[in-house]
Amino acid sequence: MNASTKKGKGLGEYMPLAFAAGIGSMLGSGIIVGLSATIVVWQEGLGLDTTQVGLLSGILTFAIAFGSLFGGRLADKIGRVLFYAIGAAICVFAPNFTVLLIGLIIAGLASGADLPVSMTIVSHDAPDEATAAQLVSTTQVFWQVGVFISFICAFLVSAMQGATGGRVVFAILAVFAVIAWLWRLLSPTFRRFHEAADVRDAARPAVVGNGKVSVTKV
């Protein structure tokens, strides 16, 4: 009973890690669903043809995939979530297809870069493998949250004229991204978790001789 209680408390203490990483998943699904749910609005508001509509969806998907492989270093220069916010903000003010496409590419790269890095940070900063596994599984809920929020926002703005509805949806995504960036940047909790994990990592090789930790697990 005591072990179970301590485990629950430990998981609860580290839940901010899951929330911070989950926001990355939420923003990723949010931009995919946000675009698909408002693509007709963008098409009518900006006068896009069917080829341009197809390019927007296809290139966004490619940008997310490319970002997950190569976008980490690029986005880390200014912060992955802030990079996402910049891309979403460009979409908000896009006057034509080209600018909208640029915004989607930037946001897609940042979204793709954030997902694997966030999972790695959760695994690194969690106190043990069991807690890390639970935290990572918890972040998956946020993907569905992003889908839900985007659909609701798209429905609420569907009656707006021109591309205004699409701009509002992307503005909401940009605001979420800025809030997430500030939270990750300024919260002392995440700094404390990361420093504690670094201390644990530094201590592990020292106890290998006692048979407590294997170097292969470091």
Description of each model-found segment:
Residues 1-218:
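Transmembrane-helix signature of 12-pass secondary carriers
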